[in-house]
Amino acid sequence: ADLGRVLGLDRAPEVKTIRRKLGELAAHRRGAEVQAALAIAHAHARPDALGFLHIDGHTRVYTGKKDLPKMHVGRLHLATHATSETWVADADGDPILVIGGKPGASLAGELVDAIPDLRSFLGPRRTATVIFDRGGWSPVCFQALIDAGLHVLTYRKAPYDQLPENAFRTITWTGPDGKRYRYRLADQSLDLPLDGGGTLRMRQVTKQTDDGVQIPILTSNTRLAASAVVWRMAGRWRQEGYFKYARTHFALDALDAYTDQPDDPARMVPNPAKKTARNTVARARTHLASANADLADAINDAVTEAGRPGHHGTALVNPKPSQGVSAATDQLADAVAASRATPSHVPLGQVRPGARLLDEETKLLTHAIRMSAYNAETTLARMIAPHYARAEHEGRALLREAFTLPGDIYITDGQLHVNLDPATAPRRNRALNALCKELTATETTYPGTDLTITYTVKDQPDPS
């Protein structure tokens, strides 16, 4: 009932009603349009944060009974049934857009596919630097992003040569966060080979850590300071921070809906028989090596026997090890031939005829709600920061407390008053009071009415 009053209803809808309404919305198949509209709204609200875009894949573990594809889940260090998505965040790590992932797709492929979505909110001419991890390493992907008017920023994938010590110089730099940083950096250019010939000129900024480890970073942005290249690349973990926070406080990995659909039976997937054939070849090689070792032992035994008195320097070699080598050689040849005849990929319908995919429409809608709620919380966290000394570490915790505080709602003189009960500590109460004054100053009206909302917090009770 209390939640219903906040929503302007006599009571909040039941969970089954919410699920039904979400299903009705998902049936329109317009989740991607909702995401695109939110991205455009984010771009209009925070244009200064669009110069750098963090892009990463996110996997959600599935523990149900449906036959979903297996994917590698980095945080668990294993492959399991899961679904994937591609997330786009702004320079501060705040989510802008989520795109449904394709089964088996690499981050490099998803980056190329995401170019039209990026252009939809960036506009046709604005450039941005796209930041991603080594999973997106692909010179072809780099070229596609650059051709689309975007810059690339990522870690270089091994192998690579170590730079000499005299290539580095110490740089002291003040970051956008106002903090001073000291780096040991080397800045150079290199050419990456492209499939089909040709090269791609890239810039490499290598950071040397205090213990001498070299971390090469590649970018096509030649106007960015070397220190800024390193600082921006390190900021990629802001997006990981969002995933962790949203899993805990916004149910990021919740199932949300049970609707599923058949996977594409014609989609080419790795052939399990190929792995079996390769294992057979490996066992045959091991068996042949063992047979050769047995033959060598037999020859050594014969040599020893021939050197004994009365053998006149001759001795017969046991024929069984030689026969074993011949048989093992034939087995290896047969295994290699069988492996070569086994295709590496086959249509999905041949190996998993009952394969399913979770329907992504509901998830796109619920992600839109989560992203909006998180970004609203982020805006409030920025507003409260000047009024709360511990805002960097406790700002969001204070807001979560404020969201659950009881209070009073009443209407007088064309105003909707929201009067919260006191927070758990005077310093928190003072910060919330300052935030309430800023929110009231916006003169926001309650949706569907002409009532102006005013926010206040009750005073702390007198301890005496």
Walk through the language-model features, giving the residues of each:
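Short, conserved catalytic/metal-binding motifs centered on acidic residues
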Residues: 1, 14, 18, 49-60, ...
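DNA-recognition alpha helix
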Residues: 1-7
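An anionic, glycine-rich sequence signature occurring as long contiguous blocks
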Residues: 97-100, 143, 148-239, 247, ...
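A short, flexible helix-boundary coil/loop motif
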Residues: 177-186, 265, 272-464
